[in-house]
Curated annotation (Swiss-Prot):
It comes from Oceanobacillus iheyensis (strain DSM 14371 / CIP 107618 / JCM 11309 / KCTC 3954 / HTE831). This is Imidazole glycerol phosphate synthase subunit HisF. InterPro entries: Aldolase_TIM, His_biosynth, HisF, IGPS_HisA/HisF, RibuloseP-bd_barrel. The active site is at D11, D130. It is an enzyme of class 4 (lyase). Belongs to the HisA/HisF family. GO terms for cellular component: cytoplasm.
Length: 254
């Protein structure tokens, strides 16, 4: 059995790490390079960097910040936001990312997933899905930083993304984002059941029990932001707890 992964997320706006609730009420948190170094040293399994306004502002990603972060860490590094072409993907990978997360552009042109997988490999191509419940047991895909409802069913989109060559899926539960009431298990487990590639749960972590709850299912990794940023949960302590709960996670290196 593969070890489950613990993944801190840096939501970056204008070169600073920020955090909000349900994709709104954005507050400044910290310098991304310093935070990245801290998570690398604490034993995070991976790091995610989202330029959260790039897509909505129709601009490219902050490659200079990506480069600075990449130089300071020795763990897998996923980058997303404002990625619309294979040229963008090439630039992000060249800047030090190991994986690229595609969201809005994939919805607008699904062929981008296929092109990325063919050119750079499925292991580099991650489909990120911002999903919101619009009826009981039905979730739609939202784009442009969660601002626009596409009307596309999230579970069907995950299956389509896999068929196009995505090697992994991040499920961002918009209703749970920043609420700290737990991950959206119905949504995330439904997607994990529907596909045969790794699924990362995102949105809602508030305590260590929430990590146990989500990783007890067929979900490969748990992504979180504010609980790590504000030292509410320490990664070494979280990993110790999960191992005690018989959930396989990589041992802390420090």
């Amino acid at each position: 059995m593969l070890a489950k992964r613990i993944i801190p997320c840096l939501d970056v706006d204008n070169g600073r790490v920020v955090k909000g609730k349900k994709f709104l009420d954005i507050q400044d948190v910290a310098d991304p390079v310093e935070l990245a170094k801290r998570y690398n040293d604490e034993g995070a399994d991976e790091l995610v960097f989202y330029d959260i306004t790039a897509s909505n502002e129709q601009r490219g990603i902050f490659l200079d910040v990506v480069e600075k972060v990449a130089k300071e860490i020795a763990i897998p590094f996923m980058v997303g936001g404002g990625i619309r072409t294979t040229k963008d993907i090439h630039q992000v990978l060249r800047s030090g990312a190991d994986k690229v997360s595609i969201n809005s552009a994939a919805v607008q042109r699904p062929e981008l997933i296929f092109e990325s997988a063919q050119k750079f490999g499925s292991q580099c191509t991650v489909l990120s899905i911002d999903a919101k419940e619009i009826a009981v047991g039905k979730w739609n895909v939202f784009i442009n930083g969660g601002r626009k409802d596409t009307g596309i069913d999230a579970i069907e989109w995950a299956k389509k993304g896999e068929s196009y060559g995505a090697g992994e899926i991040v499920v961002n539960a918009m209703d749970a984002d920043g609420e700290k009431n737990g991950y959206n298990l119905p949504l995330t487990t439904a997607i994990a059941t529907a596909v045969n590639i790794p699924v990362i749960a995102s949105g809602g972590a508030g305590n260590i029990q929430h990590f146990k709850d989500v990783l007890s299912h067929e979900i490969d990794a748990a992504l979180a932001a504010s609980v790590f940023h504000y030292d509410e949960i320490k990664i070494p302590a979280l990993k110790t707890y999960l191992n005690e709960q018989e959930i396989s996670v990589r041992r802390n290196s420090k």
